[in-house]
Amino acid sequence: MTIKAEEISALLKERIASYGSEIEVSETGTVIQVGDGIARAHGLDNVMAGELVEFSNGVMGLAQNLEEGNVGIIILGDYKGIKEGDSVKRTGRIMEVPVGEALLGRVVNPLGQPIDGLGPIVTDTYNPIERKAYGVMARKSVHEPLQTGIKAIDALVPIGRGQRELIIGDRQTGKTSVAIDTIINQKEENMICIYVAIGQKESTVRGVVETLRQNGALDYTIVVSASASQPAPLLYLAPFAGVSMGEYFMDRGQHVLVVYDDLSKQAAAYRELSLLLRRPPGREAYPGDVFYLHSRLLERAAKLNDELGGGSLTALPFIETQASDISAYIPTNVISITDGQIFLQSDLFFSGVRPAINAGLSVSRVGGSAQVKAMKKVAGTLRLDLASYRELEAFAQFGSDLDKATQSKLNRGQRTVEVLKQDLNAPLSVDKQVIIIYALTKGHLDDIPVTDIRRFETEMNAWLDQNRKDLCREIRQTGNLPSDEAMVDAITEFKKTFSPSV
């Protein structure tokens, strides 16, 4: 066997030519302390605030505290596998979540990973979780209604697309039910819904998902769940992940509804992280920037101008109060950030008024201009009527002999309360709402016994579907109130067929 020197030298030259001498440089630090979802690392001198870092076991973290000599990192996942002395390296990226159509109908965690057992989510689009809110000139005033399907809200505290309406109340007063009914009612409205569950029991989230599925609402909904058993960093990030997923659709000219259930648990998780990071505590031990935490989240809700596609993102944040105290720190913060609030009262809830909306303390600051014209006309006096009824009701308990005017106000008030009651998961279309409230305010229900009001409404809705489809269609399509003759004619025609209980 002969060895040819030319072949060997040619082969060596080829190998040398293809040799790459690129050096991969990554800044690496060492974990010096770990526990409770927090790690401190030494050696990441150039890391930036909010930058994503990677631990040696593959778990990611977010750099939060940039101190002299060490960096405070919140760990996004299980911190049990990280120990003192492990390496941690910079990624040079900020945190992003997967977004897009592929997430619709899925249940994901705040990192965008599926937790519903239905396989991987295939999308190549990612959005950063923190983004600057749109400026004043990029926005348009709120002018389109968001129909919740709940009479008490659409009549008394209307919500517009792009608005931020706080839902506030004690635990077990029906806050989540209001949100679920609103999501179910968007079926015909071509709206994307995102339900963010923060610190909820996993069984509760499962119940919500099943309710949405049974009502055909899961097809246009994304559920982001950070359950109570998950570490505080994930509870803190969940709302930001939800709004980032929503912004993808808003930027494409679509309408989005994001429900944050609830932000008091996010504030508690943020307080926990801040105290572990040794940030100075303020009122109620919350850090000084807890207001900024919620304001930068809720400011991302917007109604965009036509040049940017005219999309909208409506936010329904929840706050849980303790013993109906809306003057506590977090409730007052969020009330001052939002465009109004719906206050659910436990006394009303337990007395059978459901949804338990306190009309006196609830307000919508911008929704009035977005209300359907027909509803605006018929529900104009409803709030005042209800307020004067509540006032008279308190006095009426002391004396029995009341003058005629007071008695008629009390009678009308009782019927108003009955009309505004509604069953669970039974949102009502705007035309049916307008007709029953018209019947109420014009006195057509004054001769119907209070106990029959709910039955009267149910039977009238069925009768209207059979005999007055054109009337309902006119209200739905034009948003205007038909002539008084047409309305009175429909109501009196139905009343002839209605038999009150003896």
Swiss-Prot record:
Any GO CC annotation of this UniProt entry: plasma membrane
Main location: membrane
Complex formation: F-type ATPases have 2 components, CF(1) - the catalytic core - and CF(0) - the membrane proton channel. CF(1) has five subunits: alpha(3), beta(3), gamma(1), delta(1), epsilon(1). CF(0) has three main subunits: a(1), b(2) and c(9-12). The alpha and beta chains form an alternating ring which encloses part of the gamma chain. CF(1) is attached to CF(0) by a central stalk formed by the gamma and epsilon chains, while a peripheral stalk is formed by the delta and b chains.
Annotated site (Required for activity): 362
InterPro entries in alphabetical order: ATP_synth_asu-like_sf, ATP_synth_asu_C, ATP_synth_asu_C_sf, ATP_synth_F1_a_nt-bd_dom, ATP_synth_F1_asu, ATPase_a/bsu_AS, ATPase_F1/V1/A1_a/bsu_N, ATPase_F1/V1/A1_a/bsu_N_sf
Keywords: ATP synthesis, ATP-binding, Cell membrane, CF(1), Hydrogen ion transport, Ion transport, Membrane, Nucleotide-binding, Translocase, Transport
One Pfam entry name: ATP-synt_ab_N
Role according to the record: Produces ATP from ADP in the presence of a proton gradient across the membrane. The alpha chain is a regulatory subunit.
Chain positions recorded as ATP binding sites: 169-176
Similarity comment: Belongs to the ATPase alpha/beta chains family.
Keyword Nucleotide-binding: yes
Stated name of the protein: ATP synthase subunit alpha
Topology class, membrane: Peripheral membrane protein
Organism: Exiguobacterium sp. (strain ATCC BAA-1283 / AT1b)
Reactions accelerated catalytically: ATP + H2O + 4 H(+)(in) = ADP + phosphate + 5 H(+)(out)
Recorded superkingdom: Bacteria
Subcellular location field: Cell membrane
Annotated EC: 7.1.2.2
